[in-house]
Amino acid sequence: ASIIISSYDTSTGNSLSNKVSNSGKFETDDTGRLVSKAVDKCMEEFIATMNMKFADIQKNGRSVLVDFSFSENSSYNMTSQVGNDKLALSDVLEEWFSTNSFNNNYHIQGTTNLKMIFDDVKIPVKDKNQNNYTTNKFALEIFKYLKTLGLEPSKEIKGSTIYLTIN
């Protein structure tokens, strides 16, 4: 019997560990026994990989992607001046991510007039009160910040991706 074992981070949907194994050839009609042998062959390595990923997430944070765009009727774009300093929205967003990503760890995939994608933003596993910190909580923080800039955002979350549309 051949098996594939996979584990995923429930908060983001990101893969933690994947292993493929087979039982080898045995003379038996007992499928359960064959599956058990296949699992036994890979379980130690599977758990070690998963534990290594958990330790990395604890140390370096969880990865999320944040995609900013504009609704068709929006009067804003990434060069619109916002905030007290009247900086371009793209610059204001980068400053916010610099301060609010875990250990200042983020990467910008690209910025155009109508889109900005942070393709790897690290967020903590726990908040300052040691409560679970989820993708949804991070999205809410961004949403509230955009509101303080006088913007009217909408948000959607799919797995580890946050979509923010500025209306």
Set out the residue ranges of the language-model regions.
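Envelope-exposed proteins and targeting segments
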Residues: I3-I4, R62-V64, S160
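Solvent-exposed coil/turn segments that connect beta secondary-structure elements
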Residues: S6-T12, S69-N73, K126
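C-terminal/domain-edge helix-coil "capping" segments
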Residues: N14-W96, S101-N104
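Hydrophilic extracytoplasmic domains
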Residues: N84-N167
